[in-house]
């Protein structure tokens, strides 16, 4: 008897079409278009999981810089001052501090300024 790939093929098609749910037009209905769209989507997902980390760090830096400028210090000098003062606070925490508790952030900036002077 001839071996056919009926069951396996149906399972593969179903898997791809399930992954392509919500895609527009033939990308969610036809196997070839769906497979191409899913592969492209997975490539973007892989790439963007890595880019997300870079983008978040850039956002934190931007926020810290924006909070430092009115207090008369640039971002680079602020970070340098923190390093000299042996203050170990990561950029995410500093960013949250600048947004949520500005008074505490001002105190941290003063510590950095004293270390630079």
Curated annotation (Swiss-Prot):
Signal peptide as annotated in the record: none
GO cellular component: ribonucleoprotein complex; ribosome
Any one Gene Ontology molecular-function term assigned to this protein's record: structural constituent of ribosome
Pfam families for the chain: Ribosomal_L20 (PF00453)
Keyword entries, A-Z: Ribonucleoprotein, Ribosomal protein, RNA-binding, rRNA-binding
InterPro entries given in the database record: Ribosomal_bL20, Ribosomal_protein_bL20_C
GO biological process, one term: ribosomal large subunit assembly
Function: Binds directly to 23S ribosomal RNA and is necessary for the in vitro assembly process of the 50S ribosomal subunit. It is not involved in the protein synthesizing functions of that subunit.
Protein family according to the UniProt entry: Belongs to the bacterial ribosomal protein bL20 family.
Name under which the protein is recorded: Large ribosomal subunit protein bL20
Species whose genome carries this gene: Brachyspira hyodysenteriae (strain ATCC 49526 / WA1)
